[in-house]
């Protein structure tokens, strides 16, 4: 699709000089000359210097930062422009729905009744697929995998060897991503990335792992995930981490290896948890956490102004106590 066709089809108003063939939307640090990216926050401007993107949606006040080799597509709301453009690259669940009725043969694989399989699917030997599983186009499943009843694998999901997924889990569904108009309307961002699950991973029942906006949501080797867990788009879970039930990881959360999330932990988006860190149940995490540490703390919800006062009061009293304790220790030292 030509750039002009893309902009016209989705009513994106901007000027351009080179009407090139657009292949995809991509992250700045992974884009090619035939890709479009966007910048919605100033902290990403530093990525422009080394980016190979052919064009970037950007605000006028920041457009001077765009290298000459790249086109600046000046818009009022880059995130909204990106959301509109993403619809041109939506990948269907089944490209040809009629093909799911065609018989398919896989060597040394057990497939039980009422399994639905799309086109271009690969399944490794000794894998076991239980009734009611749905496998979309382009899915790759390794050796010795087990999919229990009603598991759904969205398009292009990759499971490496020895992956077990329990009943009702959904791998590769849309991430929860929307841009917003000036009137407060929500415009869906089509997620064109995938989920990759590395070897020796086990996932409990009714868990959802969303596919990436672009690139991969990645569950690394040896991770164990409990029932009823939500993992957002573009998350990366480090090797041999453990995620207990009802944990929610917002989009682009990343972790080192052997991290432990207690039940009902909630993580804000775009945060990193260092390796070998453990987080106690019901904790709410709103900042990066260093490696090799333990965290805990759960506060009931309250009105936001009350919460701000509470935090300020708690912090002030805690610091007073620290000072008092230090003074008492100092007095005791001089008396002795």
Curated annotation (Swiss-Prot):
It comes from Helicobacter pylori (strain ATCC 700392 / 26695). The active site is at 233 (proton acceptor). It is an enzyme of class 2 (transferase). This is UDP-3-O-acylglucosamine N-acyltransferase. Gene3D superfamilies: Hexapeptide repeat proteins, MurE/MurF, N-terminal domain. It comes from the Bacteria. GO terms for molecular function: N-acyltransferase activity. Keywords: Acyltransferase, Lipid A biosynthesis, Lipid biosynthesis, Lipid metabolism, Repeat, Transferase.
